[in-house]
Amino acid sequence: MSQTELAVFWHPDVLKHDPGSGCYEYEASPLMEVDEPHPETPERIINIRSILQRGDIRDRIRWLDGRHATREEIALFHTAAYIDEVIEAEKNATVRLDGSGTVVNPGTLDAVFAAAGTTLEALEAALNDNLAAYALAVSYTH
């Protein structure tokens, strides 16, 4: 892979999370003039992927498989108690963590673990293989 190419890491499970409509469907803010949908939707990722596949740089992109992170990898950034809380929350249909705008629902764990693992794959490629790497994932996995 040449330096002018971009390694894009992708895993389809990142699309499994439904973020809802954001915090506005939970508690509307009197400070906001209009409610808006949550910006981190599967459709946004689908559109970014489409732009990369159809756009001017499409011939300079190498698509590489992402992966699911392990629980141990997630535990490098979050406590075991928090991981357990998210796992338990997913079992209870759609819920919000700590009363916030963070929605957890069926599909969230697959999406979170896929996005985290895909991001780690891109990071490893950048650090170990000196690739220009990008993880096509969602920000709810920061």
Over which residues does each language-model region extend?
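HDAC/HDAC-like amidohydrolase catalytic core signature
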Residues: 1-140
